[in-house]
């Protein structure tokens, strides 16, 4: 048998496109037939187009500058890509066989199989043993199944194992003399991966499909009252929104409730009191608990929907403090869409009540918007009863109640069952946490505000319906976070959901409750923040909906709706455009067709479509949005099926979706 060093030198000097490589393996095949075996090939350097050569232990190595020969063993070759990418490891003057797998690519291996097809099966088996053994047989003989997978790994994995490869080279010739059945066994191992991979892929696909079904089934498992009681200590959650005209005392009332329930400590309130006094706004310090924005404190008016959380012995509450100025009605609508109960704050102070309730004041519009957004329980607090202009006057209180009752009845409230009135003082706290003093107000013996809210009937929740959460806000904090109220269903950490209307699959990584604490599950009615995976923050907008993958929310641009026109200076006809508020979404909408006019009192549909509509009329019409919007019919999901139409800063109509056009 010829000297492997000479063969290695000649083989290393061949280019990638040369024929010597094929000739050399044919020669090895002949030698193996004649001599019963062959020594391992010592590495084919430069293969792959570089044309270099790989040095052997007995070959003097010259650096590129051609100056000094290196006779002894050396460590670390300073130049890369000279036949062996990444440099060389320890080589000694004494010949050490090198594994073929170091310098051969997967394409070369297939070429090798083609050139050796004419050889007898035994030689083919031996050849495969050389190409696939090396480190694997020397170091992992007890785990042949793992070796099958390692053959297909990238070269980087092989490079990491080079030191062990060098240590096992001296033992390699002995392994070449192993019995033929072992080689045949290894040949089968070489042929198995393709079939095994195909089988594995099929099994994985089946597992993924069954896993998806089981995941959806798990996500739709019912949540009973026992689970909820264990999680929340038997306390259900209620979202309340403070509404009313600007300066009615909404933020002051909310801040005082937080202080009385212990959600804000005394030291913080005293700090706000000192700061307000220094700023010449001593009477506003309680409102600063809710109005944390500097602009809000300076102007004394709320701009954004403030959020706060408090807890009583019976319930957990989220406060939504809506802006009272007409410039921020859009924010108020977004807050009302997330509320269960509305607290309409009315100032009894002389002049302020008239300003808020008269045409153009926000008292009327806020009450209307609350009804439109599904706030069917309304608590009307006649505030500032301790003001010197009022002084707990029963006559003033009765006047306010009478006017408001007539108006609330006109916009759809059942005053006897859905509305309650009570006199309070948001600043002093009278009538909030405790009942008013009989000495000051002998004519009222009803409950205080918190007492009444704690004893209200539970809100009907769809805990086991498909999950839906309209997104009210988004942010980036070590990932993408969205905020909103769960309108139906429940959600657990790790659940898979769908972001509509973009149809992006996302995973729930973390769930945070009203107090910013991480929890494992949240149910319908909860105000939550969700950290989601699979979408970037810039690809989300308020009005998007996180929904169940199996029962996603409808994503449409056209629908049929029943519309009631409440305020319109001109007439409404086909082609009329305005702005639609539906849950947390705000979209431009156009009325494309008037279908029917509804008779007053009976709601009977007209046979002929009306040519136009005006204030006070109810119609059935087709509406079309500029972009896809996530909605449902009012019958299926009331919170996603009711909307408000606004034009030029005025609420002109309210409506509910009766049919989806897909």
Swiss-Prot record:
One of its GO terms (biological process) is regulation of translation. GTP binds at residues 244-251, 321-325, 383-386. Residues 244-251 are annotated as: G1. Pfam families: GTP-eEF1A_C, GTP_EFTU, GTP_EFTU_D2. SUPFAM superfamilies: EF-Tu/eEF-1alpha/eIF2-gamma C-terminal domain (SSF50465), P-loop containing nucleoside triphosphate hydrolases (SSF52540), Translation proteins (SSF50447). GO terms for molecular function: GTP binding; GTPase activity; translation release factor activity. InterPro entries: EFTu-like_2 (IPR004161), G_TR_CS (IPR031157), GTP-eEF1A_C (IPR054696), P-loop_NTPase (IPR027417), Sup35 (IPR003285), T_Tr_GTP-bd_dom (IPR000795), TRAFAC_GTPase_members (IPR050100), Transl_B-barrel_sf (IPR009000). Residues 425-427 are annotated as: G5. Keywords: Cytoplasm, GTP-binding, Nucleotide-binding, Phosphoprotein, Protein biosynthesis, Repeat. Residues 383-386 are annotated as: G4. Transmembrane segments: none annotated. Residues 143-193 have a biased composition (Basic and acidic residues). Residues 103-230 are annotated as: Charged. It is found in: Cytoplasm. Residues 73-193 are annotated as: Disordered. Residues 300-304 are annotated as: G2. Residues 73-102, 128-137 have a biased composition (Low complexity). Residues 9-102 are annotated as: Several sort of repeats. Involved in translation termination. Stimulates the activity of ERF1. Binds guanine nucleotides. This is Eukaryotic peptide chain release factor GTP-binding subunit. It comes from Zygosaccharomyces rouxii. The lineage of its organism: Eukaryota, Fungi, Dikarya, Ascomycota, Saccharomycotina. The gene is SUP35.
């Amino acid at each position: 048998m010829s000297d492997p060093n000479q063969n290695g030198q000649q083989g290393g000097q061949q280019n990638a496109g040369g024929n010597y490589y094929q000739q050399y393996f044919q020669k090895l095949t002949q030698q193996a037939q004649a001599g019963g075996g062959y020594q391992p090939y010592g590495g084919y350097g430069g293969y792959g187009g570089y044309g270099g050569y790989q040095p052997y232990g007995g070959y003097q190595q010259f650096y590129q500058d051609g100056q000094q020969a290196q006779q002894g063993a050396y460590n670390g070759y300073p130049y890369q890509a000279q036949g062996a990418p990444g440099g060389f490891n320890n080589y000694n003057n004494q010949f050490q066989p090198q594994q073929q797998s170091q310098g051969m690519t997967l394409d070369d291996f297939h070429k090798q199989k083609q050139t050796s097809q004419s050889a007898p099966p035994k030689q083919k088996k031996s050849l495969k043993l050389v190409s696939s053994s090396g480190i694997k047989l020397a170091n992992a003989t007890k785990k042949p199944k793992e070796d099958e997978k390692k053959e297909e790994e990238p070269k980087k994995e092989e490079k990491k194992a080079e030191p062990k490869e060098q240590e096992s080279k001296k033992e390699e010739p002995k392994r070449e003399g192993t019995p033929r059945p072992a080689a045949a066994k290894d040949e089968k191992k070489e042929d198995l991966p393709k079939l095994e991979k195909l089988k594995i892929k099929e099994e994985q696909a089946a597992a993924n499909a069954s896993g998806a079904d089981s995941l959806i089934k798990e996500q739709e498992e019912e949540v009973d009252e026992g689970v909820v009681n264990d999680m929340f200590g038997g306390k259900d959650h209620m979202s309340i929104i403070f509404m009313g005209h600007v300066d009615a005392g909404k933020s002051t009332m909310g801040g005082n409730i937080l202080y009385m329930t212990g959600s804000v400590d005394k030291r913080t309130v005293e700090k706000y009191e000192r700061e307000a006094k220094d700023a010449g706004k001593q009477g506003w310090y309680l409102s600063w608990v809710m109005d944390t924005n500097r602009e809000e404190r300076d102007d004394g008016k709320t701009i954004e929907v403030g959020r706060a959380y408090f807890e009583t012995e019976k319930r957990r509450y989220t406060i939504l403090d809506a802006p009272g100025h007409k410039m921020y009605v859009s924010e108020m609508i977004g807050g009302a869409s997330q509320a269960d109960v509305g607290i309409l704050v009315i100032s009894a102070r002389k002049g302020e009540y008239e300003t808020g309730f008269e045409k153009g004041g926000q008292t009327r519009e806020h009450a209307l918007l609350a009804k439109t957004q599904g706030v069917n329980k309304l608590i009307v607090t006649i505030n500032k009863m301790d003001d010197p202009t009022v002084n707990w006057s029963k006559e003033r209180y009765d006047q306010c109640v009478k006017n408001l009752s007539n108006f609330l009845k006109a916009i759809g409230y059942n005053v006897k069952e859905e509305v309650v009135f009570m006199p309070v003082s948001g600043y002093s706290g009278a009538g909030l946490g405790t009942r008013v003093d009989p000495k000051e107000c002998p004519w009222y013996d009803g409950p205080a505000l918190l007492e009444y809210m704690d004893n209200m009937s539970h809100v009907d929740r769809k805990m086991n319906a498909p999950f839906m959460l309209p997104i009210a806000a988004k942010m980036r904090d070590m990932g993408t976070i969205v905020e909103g109220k769960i309108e139906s269903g429940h959600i657990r950490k790790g659940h898979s959901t769908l972001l509509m209307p973009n149809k992006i699959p996302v995973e729930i990584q973390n769930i945070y409750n009203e107090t910013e604490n991480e929890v494992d599950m949240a149910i319908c009615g909860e105000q939550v923040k969700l950290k989601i995976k699979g979408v970037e923050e810039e690809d989300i907008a308020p009005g998007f909906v996180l929904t169940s993958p199996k029962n996603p929310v409808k994503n449409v641009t056209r629908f049929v709706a029943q519309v009631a026109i409440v305020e319109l200076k001109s007439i409404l006809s086909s082609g009329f455009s305005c702005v639609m508020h539906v849950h947390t979404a705000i979209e431009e909408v156009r009325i494309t067709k008037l279908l029917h006019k509804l008779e007053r009192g009976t709601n009977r549909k007209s046979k002929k479509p009306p040519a136009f509509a005006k204030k006070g009329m109810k119609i059935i019409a087709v509406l079309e949005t500029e972009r896809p919007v996530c909605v449902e019919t009012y019958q299926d999901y009331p919170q996603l099926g009711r909307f408000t139409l606004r034009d030029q800063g005025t609420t002109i109509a309210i409506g509910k979706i009766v049919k989806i056009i897909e």
